[in-house]
Design a protein with these regions (language model features):
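Short hydrophobic beta-strand element within catalytic cores of glycosyltransferases
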Residues: 296-299, 317-328
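Nucleotide-activated donor-binding/catalytic signature segment of Leloir-type glycosyltransferases, i.e.
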Residues: 247, 262-289
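N-terminal subdomain of nucleotide-sugar transferases
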Residues: 1-61, 199, 243, 409, ...
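Carbohydrate-associated surface elements
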Residues: 176, 194-197
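Conserved donor-binding/catalytic core segment of Leloir-type glycosyltransferases
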Residues: 210-231, 236-241, 253
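A short, well-ordered alpha-helix in the C-terminal region of glycosyltransferases
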Residues: 360, 367-382
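Membrane-proximal helix-turn-helix segments that form the acceptor-binding/catalytic region
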Residues: 97, 114-117, 121-125, 151-172
Length: 416
């Protein structure tokens, strides 16, 4: 069938569900096109070679990509963020109204909720099915980030309820998220939980080792991703400083960008000036090679009930890399990592516990750390792999199309 993949973020941005996802759907017999924004995430600035215009069509890996106008912004300003989300809502809505009839089904990636709201409207007008994949639970996450007041949060809640009612099927990324949605009135029969997979790609055979800057002679703790409020990386910096008191070789490397980067750099300069390095954002393949050379991978989320129901895609990625993990997480993500045997899990924002965990893994032999990493890879391949997730996703798409066809046939018979 002809599928429109609607997502605000897509290559060359660090999008989790990007060209690889679209190509996988196409490889399984579907004709896929993408509607997305001009790339500006995570820094809020347009990528080189792009200029804002109403519309631009390009091709990425053989997939037709429709670029729609957006207000570039991803800073701490609520006004800028709202303009960013609403501008893409309107351009996605116009695109869907004008061209939506060309497709048999729309697959929407959320967050943010605004593309899904646009799809809910134009799919209702065109009488076509749409599937919503939920990676981040709104409005909870917006409230937790302090980006919006109570009035806006309540409005977003109503928008989410509207989207969930209109969606043909919904894909939450964790079992606990599914339960939270059910508590809000979404029928279980309408939801299909599918875990994320890793975008990690192993180095090719015969690849030479190229140590990242500042890696040699150190015990390298690596974080790669968004430097935002939810990650509370100041705590990771504090834990590194504490662990390095006993083991001076411990060094934290932060790869990526985000609204907290400047504040984190200032904090690191005060508490751990010789034990933290900011490398900025790097490409996906380059980041995977950094992970390959890391001694330890780190992930943390804010101590908030919201984050107990999400499984950050970083969890799957780190497991696939085959490196030991220290995780400041709670809930389903913590359970997965504990079950894998590849991680030491500590409570979120518990600096002493994280420092102890980093020190414990630093004290292990290379063989012991390698064994932990292999456990993670085995767990990922068995329970969380790409092929399994894609097959499950294709099954949901086919089911949504079949449900819609049945409803349409039943409606026609009723009116006939």
């Amino acid at each position: 069938m002809r599928i429109l993949f609607l997502t605000q973020w897509f290559e060359p941005e660090p999008a989790f569900k990007g060209a690889g996802f679209a190509a996988a759907l196409r490889a399984r017999g579907h004709d896929v096109e993408v509607a997305t924004a001009f790339p500006n995430y995570p820094g809020g600035k347009l990528y080189p070679g792009y200029h804002i215009r109403p519309y631009r069509r390009e091709t990425i890996n053989g997939i037709a990509v429709h670029r729609l106008a957006i207000w570039p912004s991803h800073n701490a300003s609520p006004i800028g963020r709202i303009a960013n989300y609403l501008s893409f809502f309107f351009t996605a809505l116009v695109f869907g109204l004008l061209r939506g009839r060309r497709y048999d089904l729309v697959y929407v990636y959320h967050p943010p909720i605004t593309p899904a709201a646009a799809a809910a409207i134009f799919c209702a007008i065109h009488r076509m099915p749409f599937v919503v994949e939920i990676q981040d639970l709104w409005p909870d996450s917006v409230g937790a980030s302090n980006m919006a007041g109570n009035r806006i949060t309540r409005l977003l809640g109503k928008v989410c309820d509207f989207v969930y009612r209109r969606a043909t099927l919904i894909i939450p990324q964790s079992s606990m998220m599914l339960e939270r949605l059910h508590e809000r009135g979404v029928p279980r029969v309408k939801m299909r939980r599918i875990y994320n997979w890793a975008t990690y790609r192993p180095a090719g055979a015969g690849a030479t080792v190229a140590y990242p800057k500042g890696f040699k002679g150190r015990f390298n703790v690596v974080y790669g991703g968004n430097l935002g409020q939810a990650q509370v990386l100041a705590d990771a910096i504090d834990a590194t400083a504490c662990a390095a008191l006993d083991r001076p070789a411990i060094h934290l490397h932060l790869f990526g960008d985000g609204i907290e980067r400047q504040a984190l750099e200032m904090h690191a300069a005060k508490v751990a000036p010789t034990h933290v390095t900011f490398h900025g954002p790097v490409g996906r393949d380059a980041m995977d090679r950094v992970f390959d050379e890391a001694d330890l991978l780190l992930v943390q989320l804010k101590d908030d009930p919201l984050y107990t129901i999400t499984v950050p895609s970083k969890v799957q990625h780190y497991l696939a890399c085959g490196r030991p993990i220290v995780a400041g997480l709670a809930g389903e993500a913590a359970e997965l990592l504990t079950e894998s045997g590849a991680a030491i899990v500590c409570p979120p924002q518990d600096v002493p516990a994280m420092a102890t965990a980093i020190g414990r893994i630093a004290a292990m032999s290379i063989t012991e750390r390698a064994a932990m990493g292999h456990l993670g890879q085995d767990y990922y391949n068995t329970h969380l792999g790409f092929d399994r997730a894609i097959e499950d996703t294709v099954a949901v798409i086919d089911e949504a199309a079949a449900l819609w066809a049945l409803r349409k046939r039943t409606s026609n018979e009723h009116h006939g």
